[in-house]
Amino acid sequence: MKKKILFWVLGILGVLIIGGGIYAYNVYSSVSNTLKEVHQPLKRDQNNSNVGEKVSKSEPVSILLLGADERGEDKGRSDSLMVITLNPKNNSMKTVSIPRDTYTEIVGKGKSDKINHAYAFGGVDMSVATVENFLNVPINYYIEVNMEGFKDIVDAVGGVDVKNDLEFTQDGHHFAKGNIHLTGDQALAFTRMRKQDPRGDFGRQMRQRQVMQGVIKKGASFSSLTGYGDVLAAIQKNVKTNLTQDQMFDMQKNYKDCLKNSEDIQIPGDGHKAADGIWYYYVPDAAKQDLTNKLRTHLEVTK
């Protein structure tokens, strides 16, 4: 499935500015206040005045999209991890979905574990450091979305339309095959199912991208949204990023054509139970190195 995704999870954020054009400027004050509230620098960047230069100079950048799970036994873990690299020089984008059970070193913890546990151990700062170490590429920016509250964003845009390729029931909601409309609660259940899908986590990642696309499509019609206040409130409550408002504007201006040439990358590996009885996803060193080389080339990283 060819996907035009998560640059516009700035769609969850910036599409309110991006898609709305002149209309968005009529509510500039509300949008501006929201974007100031969602801004949360990484600890490593708080004394770094050069953190935003890559965007302003139209250099290749990377973004970690992190979906945080706030329910039950998964509370405090990252439910989804995607790395997006953007190169405005050749107008291209690559999106890497990282299986949440990937076994790797947790930077700052002194142990190896599932990559999604980094968030539980040390929040977004440890997640960024761990993903950087796993891929051996720099992560310039992050966008964190509270997946439990994501339903508020879906409802705020009036629900989303997706094409479902697998009939299943999850959390009391039945999803037929074909084109379906999802409310916020339904979208959350739709994106959480993986045990009934023979593709496992990869199938769930696909559904997450579909729902995100649906939000982006609705957000791009911002001028037709009468409840933009609800959208902004949902974003303010459920999204954090180290991107500033100016960087979002610059990204829209300088990077939007990257969507014209997008590539989605799945990480090859093997999942099985370890001696401790816990299921992990293992990525061969050779496969990881191939991925590292591809991303570093795309980001024009030479050191």
UniProtKB/Swiss-Prot annotation:
Which top class of enzyme applies to this chain? transferase
Principal subcellular localisation of the protein: membrane
Q: Which GO terms describe its cellular component?
A: plasma membrane
Its domain of life?
A: Bacteria
Q: Where in the cell is it found?
A: Cell membrane
Q: Which cysteines are joined by disulfide bonds?
A: none
Which keywords appear in this protein's UniProt record, sorted alphabetically? Cell membrane, Cell wall biogenesis/degradation, Membrane, Signal-anchor, Transferase, Transmembrane, Transmembrane helix
A GO BP term here is: cell wall assembly
> Which EC numbers does the record give?
2.7.8.-
Could you say which protein family the record assigns here?
Belongs to the LytR/CpsA/Psr (LCP) family.
- What is the recorded function of this protein according to its Swiss-Prot or TrEMBL entry? May catalyze the final step in cell wall teichoic acid biosynthesis, the transfer of the anionic cell wall polymers (APs) from their lipid-linked precursor to the cell wall peptidoglycan (PG).
NCBIfam families xrefs: lytR_cpsA_psr, PRK09379.1
Give the protein's recorded name.
Answer: Polyisoprenyl-teichoic acid--peptidoglycan teichoic acid transferase TagU
* Species of the source: Bacillus cereus (strain ZK / E33L)
